[in-house]
Amino acid sequence: MTKPKVIFFGNGLLAETVFDTLKDNVEIIFCAKKKEDLEQTIQIMKNKEQKVYGVLASFGVIIPNSVLELFEPEGIINVHPSYLPDLRGPSPIETAILRGDTEFGVSVMKLVEKMDAGPIYYQEKIAMDKFAQKSEIYERLGECGGKWVAENLTQLPKPVEQNGEATYSKMLDTKMARLRPAEQTAEEMLDQIRAFMHFPKTRIEVKGLDCIVLSAHLSNEPEPIKGHTELSLKGKDGLYLIIDEIQPAGKKAMGAAAFANGYLK
């Protein structure tokens, strides 16, 4: 049986998982990873001799109608990691982690020019462990959405318009990255570390040294290292965030004990 031909749009963690889930079930004839690849996409679609589908996951660029129209009637199929219309925008997983969610959604939708506003082909909610790592959440949602696309691409149901009030996620930037123990609970700080892993990376200043916080855990009390409590951050709720792994600016990542030995003397 001939595999359906696909142009794949995307880059980053979600795109990698969706691509890997799709690749054995479809023939991917071109990967568009950036805006400049859209021109080649147009040429392929104008010169095609067989049906070509478009599948997108985390492309990061608004695709104009002039390109979307080339893939009608199905349109470009977008795998978006939220239960739309909740958390449209560029950082749905990170925003869901920051607000303490333990249930995450994935939506397979028809792409339209307005951001994440297209009709829905398929949606699913997935429960995750309370402190699941961001990479695990990306993988689970990408596999779920990619598997559905692989199984249904050539026989898509009629999409249904989104229902309910839309909420939005924001573009992540380094201004969000710094921990604020006086303003955050210990759990909120831990959620921030999980959400900002890879980018923009959670930061804190320890004895004048700018550091990236890589992992931590919660505790009811401080956990001194050789008498030092700088890596035990008291949240506004009275609980503590205990830093387990840290990376001083310009240095390699290290465990809390190694950091204390080298910098907390």
Features from the language model and the residues they span:
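One-carbon transfer enzymes
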Residues: 1-200, 239-240, 248-250, 260-265
